[in-house]
Amino acid sequence: MRLTKYQQETIKRVLLKHFGEGSDLLLFGSRADDNARGGDIDLYIEPDLHEADDIVEAKLNALVELHLLLGEQKIVLVVNRKSGRFLPIYKIAKESGIRL
């Protein structure tokens, strides 16, 4: 995993704060691969929230807070509502992701 301890702890704290303590968090993509270079911070979350409006608000607030705390980095946040439509990116994230 190519994130510092500070980045890992900050991401986990911020996402659980906005999406609920029961949320499932994964880092996937090139930052999950120690041999890769560069790359966005790709995050997958199955939130503890159920209402679409609450999820949208949580996503916006979490991304703003992460940018303030981690600086200007490209952060991709993939949210799987569980009860929503299945997207292929969910499978990729779950198969290749590392739990935070």
PLM regions with names:
Residues 1-26, 32-38, 47-100:
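Catalytic core of pol beta-like nucleotidyltransferases
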Residues 42-44:
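Short, well-ordered beta-strand segments
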